């Protein structure tokens, strides 16, 4: 399936399909005229004598140096090669595809002045699977994601490296094998390719999509734990949350209420339970997870605006005027990434507390210590709980806001930067940790519910448990647990456990 991108109207679901499903993307044909109009305006400037930043001048601190018309192609080539300073491991293919798609959207607005030929090459690279090797580190998220995007642009010139059919090779060879020809960049085209927030935005979007999946997984795990510990569902009553009024809290309380509906375990202790209230990790799930959902929604709103934005500099306005500005500064993306990091941290924090509740016989309401059969001889989930604590702590350290850590660059010309790129990139690590943490809770809670037999959990939760047990057996006696943790990580990360439930049971991230 090919996703047709209409700049200004691209949706979260379209970008999610590119990220998760590897869908090919290309611009709507309606963009061609405005792209060509912008390119014509750049050609007029090059033919004239007036110096215009980025078109016939140097860059950054060297912006005052005028470049002759016969040197503009050399200028653009030198710009790309000199900016290929990324370090670290290559970004994953789905991230790079998202970066390239976001760059298409920005160029498709016609304010960057590139030729249609350049846009076509980018589209063809996506279609044929020429994936530039983009090192993960090197951007401070202002004046655009210069280094990572330069590595993308280098392949378009026949330089750098790319993956083709899962083999790493030179950019020139990758283009040749795909039946494509490198492009000679004309005036401003190199700058248009690297001046933008597409790397930071792609990473933040990936973090958002993964955080939402973790939120849903956390709600599911929390519902399982509520039944495993014979917790009260009264705190999920909708009127409680309507009285407070927060959208996210109301939405997730409905999810939790539906997940535990018709549970025999819950019905068995509606009366005669000496506990008056549950610990906060059970009772305050709607408040905590609702707040997490709210900030994910706020981040989503920022990121979909940014995904449809022109973040180049200078820009060609509708009247043909070329104006320098600062749309390349990724502060909105940095803030969104910091918000997502908070949600990832808190989803994990409350999950870890629920794990601790279940493994402690003093507070688990009848569950054996560490959910172990013949405790003492067997240790059960004792160290799985420690692993969860380690992952929670690691995420807490990474939740420190990246956006507050500006430093001057480029001889103090670019003296305030966003740090959006690594602020967004850490979300991938945090979400990986969180998928495992939620998986550990899901494993323990499932075993806890099995201890409540012959009482059954809800119909929905029973279907989730059946899916889990098709992949991971119940822990009857101690065994090598690492494969179980790896398997449950995959089940949570890939959304397999969520897939057995009605899609409508979870609140939607889409607001469009």
Swiss-Prot record:
It comes from the Bacteria. PROSITE patterns: PAL_HISTIDASE. Its EC number is 4.3.1.3. It is found in: Cytoplasm. Disulfide bonds: none annotated. Belongs to the PAL/histidase family. This is Histidine ammonia-lyase. It comes from Bartonella tribocorum (strain CIP 105476 / IBS 506). The lineage of its organism: Bacteria, Pseudomonadati, Pseudomonadota, Alphaproteobacteria, Hyphomicrobiales.
């Amino acid at each position: 399936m090919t996703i047709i991108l209409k700049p200004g109207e691209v949706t979260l679901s379209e970008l999610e399909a590119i990220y998760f499903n590897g869908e090919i993307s290309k611009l709507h044909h309606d963009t061609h005229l405005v792209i060509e109009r912008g390119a014509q305006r750049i050609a007029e400037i090059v033919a004239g004598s007036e110096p215009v930043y980025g078109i016939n001048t140097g860059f950054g601190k060297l912006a005052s140096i005028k470049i002759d018309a016969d040197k503009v192609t050399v200028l653009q080539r030198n710009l790309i090669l000199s900016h290929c300073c990324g370090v670290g491991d290559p970004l994953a293919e789905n991230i790079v595809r998202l970066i390239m798609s976001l760059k298409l959207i920005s160029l498709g607005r016609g304010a960057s002045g590139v030729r249609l030929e350049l846009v076509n090459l980018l589209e063809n690279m996506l279609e044929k699977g020429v994936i530039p090797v983009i090192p993960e580190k090197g951007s401070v998220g202002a004046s655009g994601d210069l280094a990572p995007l330069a590595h993308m642009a280098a392949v378009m010139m026949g330089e750098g490296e790319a993956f083709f059919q899962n083999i790493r090779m030179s950019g020139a060879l990758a283009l040749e094998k795909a039946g494509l020809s490198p492009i000679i960049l004309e005036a401003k085209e190199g700058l248009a390719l690297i001046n933008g927030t597409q790397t930071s935005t792609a990473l933040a979007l990936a973090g958002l999509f993964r955080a939402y999946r973790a939120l849903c997984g956390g709600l599911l795990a929390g519902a399982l734990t509520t039944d495993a510990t014979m917790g009260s569902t009264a705190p999920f009553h909708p009127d409680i949350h309507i009285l407070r009024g927060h959208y996210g809290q109301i939405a997730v309380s409905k999810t939790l209420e539906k997940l535990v509906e018709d549970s025999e375990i819950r019905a068995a202790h509606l009366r005669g339970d000496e506990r008056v209230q549950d610990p906060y990790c059970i009772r305050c799930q709607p408040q905590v997870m609702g707040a997490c959902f709210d900030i994910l929604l706020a981040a989503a709103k920022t990121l979909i605006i940014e995904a449809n934005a022109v973040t180049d500099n200078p820009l060609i306005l509708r009247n043909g005027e070329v104006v320098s500005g600062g749309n390349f500064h990724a502060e909105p993306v940095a803030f969104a990434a910091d918000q997502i990091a908070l949600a990832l941290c808190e989803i994990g924090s409350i999950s870890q507390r629920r794990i601790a509740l279940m493994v402690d016989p003093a507070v688990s309401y009848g569950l054996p210590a560490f959910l172990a059969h013949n405790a003492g001889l067997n240790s059960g989930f004792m160290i799985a709980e420690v692993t969860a604590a380690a992952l929670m702590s690691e995420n807490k350290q990474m939740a420190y806001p990246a956006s507050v850590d500006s430093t001057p660059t480029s001889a103090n010309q670019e003296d305030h930067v966003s740090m959006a790129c690594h602020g967004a990139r850490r979300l991938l690590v945090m979400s990986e940790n969180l998928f495992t943490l939620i998986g550990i809770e899901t494993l323990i809670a499932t075993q806890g519910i099995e201890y409540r037999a012959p009482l059954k959990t809800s119909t929905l939760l029973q279907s989730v448990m059946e899916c889990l047990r098709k992949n991971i057996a119940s822990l009857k006696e101690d065994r090598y647990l690492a494969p179980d943790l790896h398997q449950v990580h995959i089940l949570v990360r890939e959304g397999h456990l969520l897939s057995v439930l009605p899609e409508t049971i979870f609140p939607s991230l889409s607001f469009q």
